Amino acid sequence: MPKVYVTGIGFVTSIGNDCESVESHLRNLEGGIGLHPELQVDASPVKVAGIIEDFDVSSVDPEDWIYPERYRVRRDVIRSFSPHVLYAYCSMKQAIEDANLRDEEVSDPDCGLYTASGGSMRSVHKHFEKMDQRGI
């Protein structure tokens, strides 16, 4: 089996958007789940969620999203993103920076990047609505 070296990490989570914040929350046993303002309607049985600070992806138009300036994404690229893809993109940028990798090193075929996500509930909901409208 080939050796794998982890040289950089990045986080965008409900317990922090950088290594130090995430580590602090974990060491202090602090969770990232709380009352979500958009869920505080009588019709919804769900009232809590993991809120990611410094990001506002409430608009259906990705070009209206608010996120840290250091992660600026080209307009033609962000138009294809769902919120979880933006979080993954920002985490990858952190990991590349943390590893001190140059562009040519990231482009090297021997370099690999890995990300994980639970997916986008907004996308799941949107597709279920379409299925419902079509009687599927």
What function would you assign to each model-found segment?
Residues 1-136:
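Conserved "HGTGT" condensation-loop signature of ketosynthase/thiolase-family condensing enzymes
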